[in-house]
Amino acid sequence: MEKERETLQVWKQRVGQELDSVIAFWMEHSHDQEHGGFFTCLGRDGQVYDHLKYVWLQGRQVWMYCRLYRTFERFRRVELLDAAKAGGEFLLSYARVAPPGKKCAFVLTQDGRPVKVQRTIFSECFYTMAMNELWKVTGEMHYQREAVEMMDQIIHWVREDPAGLGRPQLSGTLATEPMAVPMMLLNLVEQLGEEDEEMTDKYAELGDWCAHRILQHVQRDGQVVLENVSEDGKELPGCLGRHQNPGHTLEAGWFLLQYALRKGDPKLQRHIIDKFLLLPFHSGWDPEHGGLFYFQDADDLCPTQLEWNMKLWWPHTEAMIAFLMGYRDSGDPALLNLFYQVAEYTFHQFRDPEYGEWFGYLNQEGKVALTIKGGPFKGCFHVPRCLAMCEQILGALLQRLGPAPLGSLPAVPTREGSK
């Protein structure tokens, strides 16, 4: 037990120090003091290389800052909250393409003019997360009204009428359900329902619906999890049907673990661990170089995506959360060992001890392919969310072990030593 305690304590200190470093990077380099919001196109040293603003990443950074402010005493800093509020007001003013319509842009200029719209729900989802978390830290009801109105619009698009998304219904297009849609909705159900009984009750049926739809992606008698299935939960033909995304499956896994914990369903929990944690890890982990492949083909054919064998930052952060949460909920030591395996690889390969933050894109061998720290898809989200959640779970695990004997805790490593 003492060896376990020592290892957990070392990792708690390690992720906590890394979280401090990562947030310091974004606070120093990403804030737009003129217009509000955040620059995410940042080079290795934090230099801004493009001033476009991506609505997904604006919402994510507002959410991240607010979540840290609300749940970590050391992040209860006025400059963090002020930046989050400025980002939230930027979103309120500019994210929607044609107010009072709810459709949000994907890309905005620095001063908020729309550049591009995606015909999906994801800009709106991250907008909702940002507004709800802003309400939780400020108590200002206009943020919560905005969150609930947007949530209800998203539900309408997904479950009743998608016409407002602007996607043409072409005769040759397969009716497809990507796992990302029920995943994101389940995440929003968790977000809005946290410590809010009214919202929990309002969206309970939606949470059940989302979980059921995600579980339909387990196919071939439980041997694979597919990224896309038909609307009635069957495997689709061709590359689209065989497409697998191990990192996405692992992320869905910890979303589902939260759902199973809320439901008090240990049988579902075990199924999730087997199919959404262990299955994608064992098929997706590169046995030669380590790390998770980005994409795979369920029949072991060559994937068509050029980046299929690259190692990206976010599948590894999601794996860290999933395995640590799985261990917390099940007590299975194999899951804790997998957390350590993924975390060691991730910290060694992605961290940049010289300039801070993490590289996002490695080649198959684990060498840095892109030196940027942020871009159209990488912002202040997956890395700090992972570090914050892991620090909290590790703290809970240490509490579960009880107080340490006097003199048994390891010394806290210095920031230099942790590099």
UniProtKB/Swiss-Prot annotation:
Modified residues (Phosphoserine): S418
Domain of life, per lineage: Eukaryota
InterPro entries: 6-hairpin_glycosidase_sf, 6hp_glycosidase-like_sf, AGE/CE, AGE_dom
Catalytic reactions of this protein: an N-acyl-D-glucosamine = an N-acyl-D-mannosamine
UniProt-recorded Gene Ontology molecular function terms: ATP binding; enzyme inhibitor activity; identical protein binding; N-acylglucosamine 2-epimerase activity; peptidase inhibitor activity; purine nucleotide binding
Tissue: Kidney, adrenal gland, brain, lung, spleen, ovary, testis and heart.
Residues the UniProt record annotates as site (Important for enzyme activity): C380
One Pfam entry name: GlcNAc_2-epim
Enzyme class label: isomerase
Keyword Iron-sulfur applies: no
Pathway: Amino-sugar metabolism; N-acetylneuraminate degradation
Enzyme Commission number: 5.1.3.8
Ranges for region Leucine-zipper: 185-206
GO terms (BP aspect): carbohydrate metabolic process; N-acetylglucosamine metabolic process; N-acetylmannosamine metabolic process; N-acetylneuraminate catabolic process
Keywords: Isomerase, Phosphoprotein
Homology family: Belongs to the N-acylglucosamine 2-epimerase family.
Subunit comment: Homodimer. Forms a heterodimer with renin and inhibits its activity.
Function summary: Catalyzes the interconversion of N-acetylglucosamine to N-acetylmannosamine. Involved in the N-glycolylneuraminic acid (Neu5Gc) degradation pathway.
Name the UniProt record assigns to this protein: N-acylglucosamine 2-epimerase
Organism from which the protein derives: Rattus norvegicus
Designated gene of the protein: Renbp
